[in-house]
Amino acid sequence: MMDIFPSKYINIGGDEVPKDRWNACPRCRAKMKELGLYDHDGHTAAQYLQNYVTARIQKFLNDHGRRIIGWEEILEGDLAEGATVMTWKGTGENVDSRLWNYDCIMSPRGYMYIDRYQSHEQDREPFSIGAYLPVENVYGYEPYDGVPEYGKKRILGVQANLWTEYVNTPEYLEYMLLPRLAALSEVQWVQEGHKDWERFRKALDHSAAIYDEMGLTYCKYAWGIVGLPENAQPARTPEELQKYLDSRN
């Protein structure tokens, strides 16, 4: 990994760790017993086992001049200084207060998971993971809301995530990104309390003209138009996907 990615940071993930499987695994249970891990202080033995693994990876990377980034599950147990934590579960006062002891990246699912539907008319939208996240909701995210002053100094930035389980064409990808990426940009660079939705909404007309000039596919729900154009519909079956791929060769 370090040969492939020369950056200072290496993201080790750390979320979606199947603790139930660890608890059912004889080797994992034996390792917990060997390490003297047990449920205490609001954490399970399996969570402390993950912390043990995280600490070993962190030391290895630190010894090689790198730093770890991980999702907020790496806070479970004891996390050494120097880690960077990505939070996805909530915002401000709703996150684990220990987050503010580390450099962090804000990526709350309610605002920054842009694999969600962009309109309430989901039957006319390309199939998605679910939920509803229009461009105005992305724009409405205030990273500092509910964050203590000392915590604001630890926020490195904001990240949006487009998980692509259902995204199988470039046009579909563009549709999910645009214009929500424009909203993300203002969340990132406009000073706290200075965003203005009405101004931004008018500016989207200019952005749309650029998208059109570049031949990009984008969501037009902000203009009252729902769904992908007919010539950019995503493949919904393996056969449709193969037909699409053949047409691009």
Locations of the language-model features?
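Active-site neighborhood of glycoside hydrolase catalytic domains
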Residues: 1-83, 88-101
